[in-house]
C-alpha cells in the first residue's frame, strides 16, 4: 500500500456528485478520479497515514482478486475486525469489488475481559457464517483463538492476504439488489443482530444524507473518532465521505476516550467542518476542559456538530456550547438526528443552521395517558422534562407513530415509531423469525423506539423494551436515571434503571448506581435520598443498589445496556440468596 505523506486536500479536482451512484464501487470509482481521501491520526495528533481514494481503489481491487483466489464466491461473508486503520478500509472495499459481504466486528469495548471478548467474537463469526476473518496484527492472536475449529478459508492480516495468489478471473458485476454488507446492531436490548443492507438501500440512504440531511458543500471536510463497527461510524463517517468525494480525518476511538480534547484540537487544525458524536462525547470533552482552555481552539469552521445514537439531553448541548464559547463554536452547528442500522443509518435530521429545539413536557402525562403535554405555569418542576426534536424524516421515508392496537396516532400522542423506505434492511441474517417480528411484508419497519410527532418532526423518548410498567403506568427508565444524575455525587451515565419481576408476578423498578464512596453512612443516606426523590417525582417505589465504578455494562458502541445490567443484577441477587442459604 502506498500511503501519502501529507493529508489529502479539502478541495477536489473533480466535480462534486451527491452520492448519486448505483453501488459503492461505482462511488469509489468516481471518487478515485479526484484528490481527496482518508487520513489517520495518532493519539498525539500526528498524521501517520493518508490514503487517497485513488490509492484505496487500487488496493481494494488487488485485495478483491486475492479473495477470489481463495476460492470464495460472490455473496460469501468476510469478517473484518473493525479497527480504525487504513487496512480496514482496503479490506472492506476489497470485498465490494469481489462481490463479497463484509461484516464489521467490534474491537474490545466494555466487555468483561479477554475471555468474554473471544466468546463474543466467536458468536458473531458463527452467526454470520464467515468464510474468512481478517484483522490487524494487534488482534490476530484473539481472532485466531475466537475462530479455532471453525471452517474458515483464511485467518490473518492484510500482509498475509497480500501474499496470496491473484485469481485469474474477472471481477463480478455488482447489482443494486446485491448485499453490500452486514451491520451488527449494538445489542442494547439483546444479542447483536446482523442487519442485511443491499447496495440499493445504502446508496439511497447515502444520497438522502448528502443531499437533504447535511446539504454537503464542496468545501466540507469530515472528522471522526467513532468506531468503524458502529453504523454511525461506518455509514456516516466512512461511506458518506467516500460517496461524496470528501476528505475525512480519523482519530481512533480509544485514543479519543483517553484524550477527548484531541478531538477539538484536530477539528481546529484540520479545518474540518463536520463531525458527529453521541451526547456522551460532548459531555466527555467538557469534563476534561479547564477554565480558559476553550480559547486555545478555533472551532469557528465547525458547521455541523451532529448528535445522535442515544438519548439527547438538552442540558448537555447547552453546557457544551457555553463551555466552548471562546473557541468560536456556534450553537447553531448542533444537528440532532435519528437513525438505526436497520434503516442503513439515517431516518431524520433537524433543520440546518438553527438552534436545537427542545419540547418541554409533563412526564406524568406521558406515563398516565401517553400524550406529550406541554408544561404550563402550574406544572411541578419535578415533572418537567425536555426532549430534543430530531427533525423531519428524509424524503424517501414514510413514518407513522402507532398505538398498542396498531392504530396511527396523531401529533403529540406517544407510540412506537414505524418507518418504510428504500433504505430499510432486507432483514436480519439467519434470523427469519426476528425479521418477521420487525419487518412487515409491505415494508414497514418496527423500530422498537418510542416517540411522537411535533410540527412534522420526530421526538424520541426511549426504547419500548426498556419501559418499566408499574400498576399500568409506562415509566421511562431515563426518568428514574435522571433523578439519580441530578445528585451531586453521581456523574452523567453512572446510573441505569430497569424492571425485575416481583413476588406477586408484577414488576418492580431497580436503579443501579456507580458510586465510589465506601463510608456506610454516606451510602445509606444516598440510597434513602434516591428512593425518596424517585417516589416523590415519579410516584413509584424503587430499589436502589450502589455498585463500584466501572460496573455498569455497555454495548460494543458504548451505549448503556439495561438488559445486561438487569441480568447482572439478577445474578447478584441469586448469588446473595445462595450465600445466605449456605450460611443458614
Locations of regions flagged by a protein language model:
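Conserved AMP-binding/adenylate-forming core of the ANL superfamily
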Residues: 39-90, 110-119, 173, 197-200
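Conserved pre-ATP/AMP-binding loop-to-beta segment of ANL
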Residues: 36, 165-184, 190-191, 201, ...
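Conserved AMP-binding/adenylation subdomain of ANL enzymes
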Residues: 203-221, 231-273, 288-293, 352
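ANL superfamily adenylate-forming
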Residues: 45, 109, 113-114, 118-124, ...
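Conserved AMP-binding/adenylate-forming
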Residues: 303-305, 312-337, 341-457, 465-467
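N-lobe entry segment of adenylate-forming
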Residues: 1-51, 55-70, 74, 98, ...
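Conserved C-terminal "lid"/linker of ANL adenylate-forming enzymes
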Residues: 494-499, 510-511, 531-584
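AMP-binding/adenylate-forming catalytic core of the ANL superfamily
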Residues: 268, 275, 421, 426-427, ...
Amino acid at each position: 500500500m502506498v500511503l501519502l505523506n501529507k493529508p489529502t486536500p479539502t478541495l477536489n479536482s473533480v466535480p462534486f456528485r451527491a452520492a448519486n451512484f448505483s453501488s459503492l464501487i461505482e462511488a469509489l470509482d468516481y471518487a478515485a478520479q479526484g484528490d481527496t481521501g482518508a487520513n489517520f491520526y495518532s493519539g498525539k495528533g500526528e498524521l501517520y497515514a493518508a490514503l487517497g481514494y485513488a490509492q484505496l481503489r487500487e488496493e481494494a481491487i488487488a485485495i478483491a482478486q486475492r479473495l477470489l483466489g481463495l476460492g470464495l464466491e460472490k455473496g460469501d461473508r468476510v469478517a473484518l475486525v473493525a479497527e480504525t486503520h487504513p487496512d480496514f478500509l482496503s479490506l472492506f472495499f476489497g470485498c465490494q469489488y469481489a462481490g463479497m459481504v463484509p461484516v464489521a466486528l467490534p474491537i474490545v469495548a466494555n466487555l468483561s475481559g479477554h475471555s468474554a471478548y473471544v466468546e463474543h467474537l466467536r458468536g458473531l463469526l458463527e452467526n454470520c457464517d464467515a468464510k474468512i476473518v481478517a484483522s490487524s496484527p494487534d488482534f490476530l492472536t484473539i481472532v485466531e483463538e475466537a475462530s479455532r475449529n471453525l471452517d474458515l478459508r483464511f485467518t490473518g492480516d492484510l500482509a498475509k492476504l497480500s501474499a496470496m495468489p491473484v485469481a485469474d478471473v474477472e471481477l463480478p458485476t455488482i447489482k443494486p439488489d446485491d448485499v453490500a454488507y452486514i451491520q451488527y446492531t449494538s445489542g442494547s436490548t439483546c444479542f447483536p443482530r446482523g442487519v442485511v443492507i443491499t447496495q440499493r438501500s445504502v446508496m439511497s440512504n447515502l444520497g438522502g444524507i448528502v443531499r437533504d440531511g447535511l446539504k454537503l458543500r464542496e468545501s466540507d471536510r469530515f472528522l471522526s473518532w467513532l468506531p468503524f463497527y458502529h453504523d454511525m461510524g461506518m455509514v456516516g463517517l466512512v461511506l458518506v465521505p467516500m460517496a461524496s468525494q470528501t476528505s475525512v480525518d480519523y482519530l481512533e476511538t480509544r485514543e479519543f476516550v483517553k484524550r477527548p480534547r484531541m478531538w477539538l484540537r484536530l477539528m481546529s487544525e484540520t479545518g474540518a467542518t463536520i463531525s458527529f458524536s453521541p451526547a456522551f462525547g460532548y459531555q466527555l470533552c467538557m469534563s476534561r476542559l479547564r477554565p480558559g482552555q476553550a480559547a486555545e481552539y478555533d472551532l469557528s469552521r465547525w458547521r455541523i456538530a451532529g448528535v445522535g445514537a442515544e438519548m439527547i439531553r438538552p442540558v448537555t448541548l447547552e453546557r457544551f456550547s457555553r463551555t466552548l464559547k471562546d473557541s468560536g463554536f456556534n450553537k447553531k452547528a448542533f444537528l440532532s438526528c435519528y437513525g438505526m442500522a436497520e434503516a442503513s443509518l439515517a431516518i431524520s435530521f433537524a433543520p440546518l443552521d438553527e438552534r436545537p429545539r427542545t419540547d418541554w413536557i409533563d412526564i406524568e402525562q406521558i406515563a398516565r395517558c401517553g400524550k406529550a403535554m406541554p408544561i404550563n405555569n402550574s406544572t411541578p418542576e419535578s415533572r418537567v422534562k425536555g426532549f430534543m426534536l430530531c427533525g423531519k424524516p428524509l424524503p424517501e421515508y414514510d413514518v407513522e407513530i402507532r398505538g398498542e392496537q396498531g392504530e396511527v396516532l396523531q401529533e403529540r400522542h406517544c407510540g412506537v415509531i414505524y418507518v418504510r423506505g428504500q433504505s430499510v434492511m432486507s432483514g436480519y441474517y439467519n434470523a427469519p423469525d426476528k425479521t418477521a417480528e420487525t419487518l412487515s411484508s409491505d415494508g414497514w419497519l418496527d423500530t422498537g423506539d418510542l416517540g411522537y410527532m411535533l410540527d412534522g418532526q420526530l421526538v424520541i423518548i426511549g426504547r419500548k423494551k426498556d419501559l418499566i410498567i408499574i400498576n399500568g403506568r409506562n415509566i421511562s427508565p431515563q426518568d428514574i436515571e435522571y433523578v439519580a444524575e441530578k445528585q451531586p455525587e453521581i456523574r452523567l451515565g453512572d446510573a441505569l434503571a430497569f424492571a425485575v419481576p416481583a413476588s406477586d408476578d408484577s414488576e418492580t423498578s431497580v436503579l443501579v448506581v456507580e458510586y465510589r464512596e465506601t463510608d456506610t453512612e454516606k451510602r445509606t443516606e444516598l440510597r434513602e435520598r434516591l428512593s425518596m426523590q424517585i417516589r416523590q417525582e415519579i410516584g413509584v417505589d424503587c430499589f436502589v443498589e450502589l455498585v463500584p465504578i466501572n460496573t455498569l455494562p455497555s454495548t460494543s458502541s458504548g451505549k448503556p445496556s439495561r438488559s445486561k445490567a438487569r441480568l447482572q443484577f439478577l445474578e447478584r441477587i441469586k448469588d446473595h440468596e445462595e450465600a445466605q442459604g449456605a450460611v443458614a
